[in-house]
Each structure stands twice: as C-alpha cells, then as structure tokens.
Amino acid sequence: MTTENATPIQALATGATLNLPGKRSVADERLHRKQRLAAAFRIFGQWGLGEGAAGHITVRDPEHPDTFWLNPFGVHFSRVKVSNLIRVDHDGKVVEGNHPVNRAAFAIHSQVHQARPDVVAAAHTHGIYGRAFSSLGRPLAMISQDACAFYQDQALYDEYGGVVLELHEGARIAEALGGRKAVILRNHGLLTVGDSVDATAWWYLSMERSCQVQMLAEGAAHGQPLRTVPEESCRQAYSVVGTPFAGWFSFNLLYDKLVGESPDFLN
C-alpha cells in the first residue's frame, strides 16, 4: 500500500503496512467477534467501567444478524469470557447460552441494531465520567485532539425517563443517535457504536476519557472559556483519529496487552 491510498493513521506508520484482517468464514468471524467482545468486557472492567450489574456491549452474529451476543446478566465484567456469552434476539429471547439477559440491554441495543444495519457492535455502561458529564446535558466540546474523534459525530439524548426497560425508549435513543458513532444520554451515560467490537469499545473508552478531560479543564478554567480546536483542524484530526480503522487499531493495542496478561477470557 502506498501513502497515496493509505488512511491517515496508516500513513503515520513507516515500515510494515498496517492493514485490517482479511475476510473470514462465518464460524471464524463469529469466534473472532466473541473473543473481541469478551476482551472488551475485561478491558472495561480494568478501566473501572463496571457498576454493579449495569452495562452491556453487544455484537451482531455474522450468520443471524437479527440476533446479537452480549454479557450474561449478573456476571462482573472482569469474569466475562467467550464461553459464557449469550445470544439473544431482538425480543430479548435467549437463543444460545445458559444465563439470564439484562432486559435493559435488549431494550436499548435491539433498537439501535434495528435502526442501524451498518452497526456491528454497541456499547453502554455507567462510567463515572460519562455519567457526570451527561448531567450537563450538552455534547463534548472540541478541546483536544482526542475529542476530535467525535467531531460532528456525536448526539445528545436530552431526556431521562428512568431505567430503560421498554422498546419505545430504546427507539428514541436510536433516533437521537441517528447516523453518528456516539450519543450522550442525559443523566445516564454514554453509548457508542461501530462497525466492529474493536472500534465501538475504543470510542467508548475515548469518549469516557474525553468527558473526564473536559470536566478537569472546566474546573481549572474557573469560569474562563476553554480554547477549542478550530474547525479546519477538527476536520483534519477527525480524518486521523475518528475513522473506523483508527478505532480498530487503537483497541488492538489493549487487546494484545490483555492476551499477554490474562488470556483466560478466550476460554
């Protein structure tokens, strides 16, 4: 691959070319998605994103795209592994696995997956900084290079109707998300989506950290306005750090680290 047809993040590298993996068989793709899903939960657990039984990440099944895999209800993120993942349909019926499902998971995620055929995975947890920032009822400001990953690619769901247990609430969240990669759920937290578990998980981690950075910056500013990134620079930064490839690549660093340190999630 030449630098002329490389993505911006690929063009940053010299030497060996950075490429997405090639096409897999259905069985291999299913295993790959489940491995990445289990890894995402472990990494979320390491980042302190588990809050009791709240939170879920889902990924479509490659053979039956009207069903998705997710974490078993009542199992801590740090204990999730490939073998205890469950598969449910959009009505919340467990079609594979021996654990219960969080009703809120399919109420939100089923509607997102139905509304967005391009979405392979979706993530929502109750992270500390995402929850705190969501109470402000506004989108992230473009105050850093990392925040620019969400430039014109975030939404705000500016209401809270209690714990999401009904499909109509999930449908409103999906409508607010639109065609973007992330939505801030007021008084609730964050939700991100992507064309892979890898990118989806990375967008969540990055947005959670960007919420933290903005609140720290606003606290240090003592009421003074923050210096935001100019529009042209936002667009350039987004082309590097906001693409699906960038999300996939960034998560893979964490995945490789997890495989080296705690490979039992693959069981």
Where are these regions (language model features)?
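Short, basic, glycine/proline-bearing loop/turn elements
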Residues: K23, D89-P100, Y151-E159
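A contiguous binding-surface segment within folded domains or other stable secondary-structure elements
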Residues: A155-T192
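Short HxH-centered metal-ligating active-site micro-motif
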Residues: D89-G130, L167-G179
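Short beta-strand-to-turn element immediately C-terminal to the catalytic PLP-Schiff-base lysine
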Residues: R60, R87-V88, F133-S134, V193-G194
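Structural motif
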Residues: D66-F68, K93, V120-A123, G130, ...
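A conserved C-terminal secondary-structure "cap"
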Residues: T2-I43, K181-N267
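N-terminal low-complexity or amphipathic/hydrophobic leaders
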Residues: A16-D91, F249-N252
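Class I SAM-dependent methyltransferase SAM-binding "motif I" and its flanking Rossmann-like core
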Residues: I128-L165, E169
